[in-house]
Amino acid sequence: MRQHAPIKAPRIFSSLPGWPRDAVCCFLLIVLSVIFLHKVVFLGKVLLPADLLLLMPPWKSHAAEMFPDFHRVYNPMLDVIQQYYPWRLFSSTWIREGVLPLWNPHMFSGTSFVANGQSAIFYPLNLLFCLMPVKLAFGWTAVMHLALIGVSTYGFLRCILARRVAALTGAVAFMFCGFISAWLEFTTFLCTATWLPISLYIFERTVCRHSSVASDPTPPSRFYVGMSLTGLSLGMALLAGHLQIGLYVWLTFGAYAAYRMISVGSVIPGRSQERARTPTRPHSPGRFLSRVVLAVMIGLFVGAPQWLPVMELTHFSTRAGEFRLESIWGARLTVTHLLTFLVPNFFGNPVDYNYWGSFNFIELSGSIGVVALLLWVPALVALFRRKADRCESPDSHQQTGFWLALLLVSMSIAMLTPLYYVFVHCIPGFAQLRGPARALLMIDFSGAVLAAHGVEALLRRVDGESRRALHRATLIVAGLLTGVMMVGVLFLAQEYLSDFFFSYGMRQLAVFAWFLVVGVLLMRRVSQRPSNNGNAYQLPSLGSPAMLAYFLPVLVAVELFVADMRFNPQLDAEMVYFDTPSTRYLQEDPSMFRVLGIGTSFLNWLPSNTLMSLGLEEIQGSDSLWTRNYAGYLNDVQPGAPTFGWNSQLSPRLDDLNVKYVLAPPNMGLEPPPGELILDGDLRIYRRPHPKPRCYVDDGRALEYHWLNPNHLRVQIGEGSAGDTALHWSNACYPGWQVWVDGQRGNLRSRSEVVQTAVLPAGSDRADIVFYPTSVKLGIFLMCLAAGMVSASLARGWRGRLSSITQQSIARSTSRRRMVSATER
């Protein structure tokens, strides 16, 4: 069969060489990320659900006066304002002082902060929180990472595809997909997901260069540089703060590396397409594997300061134990929720206060838009007709097959099929993960790559029969999608049928139908033959198929903007933890103490972690990982803790926890009262009569102490005792604490779950209690080792580059002298 030439892409920037045109595309992606969060960039809004605080004491009492336009919460994303903001505020405050906060004294009577994977204290890009106000940094971090996602996805797709419009379409589909948009304010999810396309881009660029032709070989030193940078990006995925998402990044990379190890001898139709006719260099799979292992080692070593402490805490946490299916069954991606791939708001939206899905909206968000789904059709048609259509690149079919297979595997993980158990038994720690639907990250990325392959297939000139097959398949798929949607409406959503023409549901269906029809018509027009009679140097007309192809990424962007742009609250900065009389009273108390917050309902109390933003310490907390020993102790005092429904505020065990104040909402009376009511305003503050001091000796004498930093407590013993005595310190027990008495290493042991004890020799004057666990020491050592490996690779690559430049310079000089000699003769 005669081989057909591809449709030439329009020369919109015909006067520019290749890289400036790529730069223009990347600039457009950055502009889109700015538009998506324009209120943050241009209006100074904060990307935080700060209005949730206006429903909680003590801020609730001042909401009407300070924010008269406030009527209801925009989108109740509690974890962002309850967890992420206090953690970022705490870490950035101490990093500005030159201290890495390894311990957090503000939650759970003290807990390991570095082992809280979402603290991300080693993640370099979190320095932005230290350079500007934390509440503003949330928005700018999102803009930066959203732009990085778009640019790196575009770069990766340019490596594996020939056409810029295809790469642009895939980049837009992924950077604004449902997963990224829904988790945008959860910084650890966003930051970790960013390194998926970055790692694949560096890896693929390295492999493409290395597997190029013998006339332009890549020196082995530069291959090592590429693999080292790949490992560095994989390590960043571990440092960014969410190990589950990081694991999905690593799974995707591992699968793709295995695929490329098999196909490394073939040239993908990207930037080396013009050299594809020259024979490629032979490769040894073993040598290729060894260099991939180098990248994996560097990635593990770079991320070691984060994942080693997390694994240590996991061993002691409430999640330790056997895998329990019932604990994650409700968080799976159900068959019915696949309808949200077509209509993202099929089950409503929290912003509209009408969500009725089976689980959390954010956990199940993963749409890339119906237009992107339609673009799968030409890619799959080209895959299944690869023998009939002898296209220019057989490897493009291999790529399509790989990403289709990865998408199906990801779906099986998200939907808790039996394949999920394979990962549970083969990957350490996988059984303790929650939220299987978070595999939507891999689903969305695979779907975006398939959409890009679809655009590539649309622009490939094929014979009339293949084009007709594509048109038929597109119409059939569009009909099937419409049928599936109608079945879902009839059996699941009776609300769609009430007030038929004016209901919320019908508006969503109308949006779906519009993009479906426009997408089908645009794809049909793009797949036609070009109208410039094959003259590649003639600028196509505005209505030509090649020019219309650039409307595909525009259509994908418009659809995703319509679905997702309004989801994330962008609010006034003044709402974020503003001062009140009660918070000022607590902050002005010079003593060291802990507090207990109680209430009557989920919103009518001072939630755990919020006090951390005020610099106060509490015995409860909110985190996915905390030690089971402390959880057992706290639940012995109050079953179900941490909770607002606390009725054991008179328990003597609170004395051991150094609880000085009990905080209750203003409309809540406590009988009997836990202590003296000293303030009755926007909070009711009770002072308990006899809390034990934080540090004391055997005879009960309180010791003076202060935190030098979160990792270092200094205790002044004062008047020495006639003989040895014991120092008792109220702190949740955790491995990694060391005590130094007058400069000599002492022995610190646990007396109970919440009290640690050290022997003080007679005449002791000072004790320093320091938190520096072995997991952190080992992790930092491995990170330094990885830094050395990367530096050595870069130095080797630079020497190779200098040597190459020198040889080229010598060759040019020799050639010039020969030409001069020949001219003189």
Q: Where are the predicted features?
A:
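Active-site lumenal/periplasmic loops and adjacent helix-entry segments of GT-C-fold
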Residues: 40-160, 165-195, 333-363
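Active-site-proximal, structured, solvent-exposed surfaces of multi-pass membrane proteins
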Residues: 374, 620, 678-681, 689-806, ...
